[in-house]
C-alpha cells in the first residue's frame, strides 16, 4: 500500500482519522464507496522531478489502488491545489455531518442541549484540537443563513404569485 502525507487543518485530520481509522494512528484507508476516495483518485499525479518526497504532515493517506488506471507507485503526488481541494471536501463532510446531527436534535424535540450534541460528536471521532463553542458558533451561523434563505424565498414567492 502506497501512502502519502498531507498537512490539513488539525481538527479535520482528527475527524478523518476518527471516521475511517477508528481513532487509531497510522495510515488512513478510505473506502472506495466514499466521494473522498474518488476525489483523491482524480487529484493523484506524477511527482515532478524537482519536488522532493515529503515525510511531514498530520494526515497519512493510503492512496487509492484500482485494477485499471493510475498506478500509485507512479501517480503518488498530491499538489498544493489538490491538498486544498481535499481539505475543502473534508471540511464539507465534517460540517454536513455535524449540522445534520444538530438539526436532528432540533427536529426530535431538542432533548439534548446543542453543546452536549457537539461534545458527543467530538468524542465519537476523538477530536481535541477545536473547541465545542467554535463548532456551535459555526452551526448557529449556518442555521441563521438557512433561515434568511427561507425568508427570501417566501418573499419572492409572495411577490411573483400576486394575481
Task: Describe the function of each predicted region.
Residues 87-109:
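Positively charged, polyanion-binding regions of nucleic-acid-associated proteins
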Residues 120-136:
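Short, basic interhelical loop/turn and adjoining N-cap
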Residues 138-153:
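Short, basic alpha-helical nucleic acid-contact segments in DNA-binding proteins
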Residues 79-87, 148:
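Basic DNA-binding region of bZIP-type proteins
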Residues 153-163:
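Intrinsically disordered, low-complexity basic tails/linkers immediately adjacent to helix-turn-helix/homeobox/MYB/SANT
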Residues 104-125:
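Short, charged amphipathic recognition helices of the HTH superfamily
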Residues 1-82:
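Long, low-complexity interaction regions most often at the N-terminus
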Amino acid at each position: 500500500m502506497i501512502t502519502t502525507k498531507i498537512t490539513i487543518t488539525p481538527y479535520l485530520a482528527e475527524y478523518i482519522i476518527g471516521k475511517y481509522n477508528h481513532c487509531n494512528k497510522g495510515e488512513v484507508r478510505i473506502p472506495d464507496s466514499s466521494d473522498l476516495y474518488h476525489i483523491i483518485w482524480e487529484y493523484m499525479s506524477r511527482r515532478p522531478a524537482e519536488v522532493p518526497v515529503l515525510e511531514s504532515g498530520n494526515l497519512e493517506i493510503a492512496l487509492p489502488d484500482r485494477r485499471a488506471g493510475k498506478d500509485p507507485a507512479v501517480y503518488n503526488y498530491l499538489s498544493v491545489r489538490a491538498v486544498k481541494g481535499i481539505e475543502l471536501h473534508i471540511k464539507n463532510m465534517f460540517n454536513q455531518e455535524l449540522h445534520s446531527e444538530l438539526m436532528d436534535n432540533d427536529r426530535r424535540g431538542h432533548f439534548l442541549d446543542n453543546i452536549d450534541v457537539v461534545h458527543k460528536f467530538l468524542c465519537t471521532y476523538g477530536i481535541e484540537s477545536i473547541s465545542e463553542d467554535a463548532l456551535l458558533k459555526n452551526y448557529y451561523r449556518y442555521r441563521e443563513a438557512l433561515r434568511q434563505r427561507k425568508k427570501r424565498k417566501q418573499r419572492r414567492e409572495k411577490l411573483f404569485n400576486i394575481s
